Amino acid sequence: MAVLLCFMCLPLLFLVFAFLFLADGDLTLMSKRRVKREEIKDKVIWITGASRGIGEVLAKQLASLDAKLILSARNEAELERVKNQLTGKYAPNEVKVLPLDLASGEDSLRDAVNKAESFFPDAGVDYMIHNAAFERPKSTALDVAEEALKATININVLGTISLTQLLVPFMLRRGRGHFVVMSSAAGKVPAPGQAVYSASKFAVNGYFHSLRSELYQKGIDVTIVCPGPIDTSGSNGMTSAGKKEKRLSSERCAELTIVAATHHLKEVWISDQPVLAVMYIGQYMPTVGYWLMDKVGGKRVEAAAQGGNTYSPGLLFGNKKAN
């Protein structure tokens, strides 16, 4: 009987493994089939890092869902470019451009929050999408210059937290608010070659999960998004051999991010394989996950230095410059 049951379970196991292999998000995220448009329509959504990459694509998709948008980044000209490309009920004419440097200090951030809260009559910020981040080319943990270390922490952690602290009181007065935090797979598992960036994302994950636990009963929600390698305008994913690393498109990442936010998911993972599998292993079998990272860590740093594929499974078998 036991043998018969095993054979009966094989098709189910095959389907599960096939799903995991083909999926570009975690199981909970993949179970949500569509964006809940009613959660977005006519809502005020503030996006940092909106001048390029995932932030730009999020702006385009949210505008098409009839959201009221506030776009922030340091480059005002690029924000205007993005604004002029948007279409929707409120776009482009009613899209607000709000230049912002997360490392500019509390007074500057407070001024930005006050402006964001006043842009739309009788409507404050409903969604705050923390997308802005500072990331340097891959290097060893010991080779990060002090300037890059400070910039990473100031923007990814301190500036993001300060902006949140200044915005939350407005949300609490309304009894609602939702933070969507663009974290990283590097905030879930070790990221050899990205030690400081990884540290900043682990910090952000810890802060925002704690914030949600403290304020959820008061109407404040948090969705943490952990993407793996994404194909953005600032990163073409090409190796020195001219071969492209496997990266998920910005459009797909943005789409799944909006799905996660509108379904009020707590944390989601978005990535192609093998990074998604590594995240599962790190979450549910951490000892194995650390063993894997220890096995490939040094080779991954060397692959980055040589222009190789830093996401190739071949690194596990000693191929430093895997294609």
For each predicted feature, which ranges?
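SDR active-site lid
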Residues: 212-274, 287, 291
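Conserved glycine-rich cofactor-binding loop
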Residues: 51-52
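Conserved glycine-rich Rossmann-like NAD(P)H-binding loop of the short-chain dehydrogenase/reductase
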Residues: 65-82
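Residue(s) in the substrate-gating loop at a strand-loop-helix junction
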Residues: 184
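Rossmann-fold cofactor-recognition segment
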Residues: 88-106
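Active-site helix of classical SDR
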Residues: 164, 200
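Substrate-binding pocket helix/loop in short-chain dehydrogenase/reductase
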Residues: 139-141, 145-150
